[in-house]
């Protein structure tokens, strides 16, 4: 969702069961040389590691001249150390580790012409996980009531949505499409193309400190992707998304990434030409294969979302509604099967299934089917909420399909309750619900924009109803509500809502 480019459209803590890591030990796994070394940067020293349950925290001393640090983890299947994340500080936490030994390396990086170059990597860091249990999980067993029949059927999906709490969208940022930038553009050029500043760790920390528990990062991967029919996503683009994902996970929040509008190629799914439809699926598979493989070892607090609002009307073409629903269901099933096939943590990673148009009524239609899944209790459904559209989307009184500059009557509140109650179809079946976007357009008057009357009531009711039903609501924001310059709310009443 783009509301005229202004409304911009995380349990591992546990018993101390680990062993002190061993450094500079005799290697008993292949130790592949990490490429692209920047000789001027020395290897990080003073490395320390601690283990708690199924997570490890690794710290090191600052390296002179470093712009950040790259964390590598050994991948037994690839027999190589692969990049896990890039962080700006001198500490990182990796959660969700399985029982056994895990190997890491740290390298300082500097940024040259927008591209990170890694210095000499550290000696291998060995971390031993004796148990993958967590106190949080045990505590929940002791203090919560027995799950309902529906929650047993689908496992932990409902509890995942509840744990995600209040969410926030990094809107008009990594999903910005800007063909005018040309072939030499950097990821940060796209990041700023729709008017937002470069995302910093301070910004994401401010999101956390403002009361949010999860962050959705819409992404337009096609911005930097090959045009040779192989649909190879640029390593540079991955690196930038890695950084932002790292900011979110380092702040112990859930993180969602997707394929967003992405320039509109989704409409090819609805073409009358079978070859065009087949090419669209080839593209979709190629993109999700790369994304899933790239993030296969990331914490399960990183959630993949199958699509955005385009899955539905934009993929329909001249098909009947029945055929369109079948196509949407097929795309979502392909997404689940493909991600699970890539292994690693993707075997059990929570996956967010985009509803039809992400519209509540259309997604609640019986023709929309949730995919089958080899993992138990890991599927959630995604819908968006911009109703009434004349209030939430329209920003001026001359809007051709109507305009409202206020909200908050009993009729308005009752209509919202009725909409949310439709989603019981999913929670009753044990599926967690994520309202991936909701928001209200500002009122435009000349060149100025002001918040509409009742925006506070709209947000308050979305948050309170979501808490009542166990949904995760995610505010769409492009600095309208949480300024990325000041890292503060733009309206005083927001502090009381979030």
Predicted feature residues:
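Beta-strand-rich modules
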Residues: 94-116
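N-terminal carbohydrate-binding accessory modules
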Residues: 138-214
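Sec-dependent signal peptide cleavage junction
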Residues: 19-40
């Amino acid at each position: 969702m783009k509301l005229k480019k202004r409304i911009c459209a995380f349990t591992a803590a546990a018993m101390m069961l680990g062993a002190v890591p061993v450094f500079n030990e005799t290697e008993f796994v292949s130790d592949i040389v990490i490429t692209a070394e920047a000789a001027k940067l020395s290897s990080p020293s003073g490395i320390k590691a601690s283990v708690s349950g199924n997570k490890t925290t690794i710290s090191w001393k600052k390296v002179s001249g470093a712009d950040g640090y790259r964390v590598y983890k050994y991948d037994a299947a690839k027999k190589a150390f692969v990049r896990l994340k890039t962080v700006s500080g001198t500490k990182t936490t990796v959660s969700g580790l399985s029982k056994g030994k895990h190997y890491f390396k740290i390298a300082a990086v500097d940024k040259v012409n927008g591209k990170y170059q890694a210095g000499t990597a550290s000696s291998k860091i060995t971390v031993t996980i004796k148990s993958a249990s967590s106190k949080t999980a045990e505590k929940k067993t002791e203090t919560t009531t027995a799950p309902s029949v529906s929650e047993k059927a689908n496992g932990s999906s409902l509890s995942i949505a509840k744990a995600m709490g209040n969410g926030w969208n990094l809107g008009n940022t990594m999903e910005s499409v800007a063909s005018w930038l040309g072939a030499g553009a950097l990821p940060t050029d796209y990041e700023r193309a729709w008017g937002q500043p470069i995302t910093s760790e301070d910004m994401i920390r401010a999101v956390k400190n403002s009361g949010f528990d999860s962050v959705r990062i819409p992404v337009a991967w096609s911005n930097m992707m090959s045009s040779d029919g192989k649909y190879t996503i640029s390593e540079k683009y991955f690196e930038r998304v890695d950084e932002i994902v790292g900011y979110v996970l380092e702040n112990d929040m859930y993180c969602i990434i997707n394929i967003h509008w992405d320039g509109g190629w989704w409409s090819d799914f609805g073409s009358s030409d079978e070859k065009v439809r087949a090419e669209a699926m080839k593209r979709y598979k190629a993109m999700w294969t790369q994304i899933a493989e790239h993030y296969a070892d990331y914490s399960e607090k990183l959630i993949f979302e199958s699509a955005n609002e385009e899955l539905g009307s934009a993929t329909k073409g001249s098909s009947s509604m029945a055929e369109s629903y079948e196509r949407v269901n097929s795309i979502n099933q392909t997404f689940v099967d493909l991600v699970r096939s890539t292994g690693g943590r993707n075997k059990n990673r929570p996956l967010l299934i985009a509803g039809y148009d992400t519209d509540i009524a259309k997604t609640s239609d019986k023709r929309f089917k949730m995919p089958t899944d080899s993992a138990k209790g890991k599927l959630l459904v995604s819908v968006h909420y911009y109703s009434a559209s004349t209030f939430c989307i329209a920003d001026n009184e001359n809007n051709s399909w109507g305009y409202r500059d206020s909200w908050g009557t009993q009729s308005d509140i009752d209509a919202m309750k009725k909409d949310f109650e439709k989603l019981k179809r999913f929670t009753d079946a044990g599926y967690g619900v994520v309202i991936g976007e909701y928001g209200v357009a500002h009122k435009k008057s000349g060149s100025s924009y002001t918040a509409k009357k009742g925006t506070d009531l709209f947000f308050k009711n979305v948050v309170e109803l979501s808490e009542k039903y166990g949904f995760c609501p995610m505010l769409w924001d492009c600095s309208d509500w949480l300024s990325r310059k000041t890292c503060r709310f733009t309206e005083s009443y927001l502090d009381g809502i979030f």
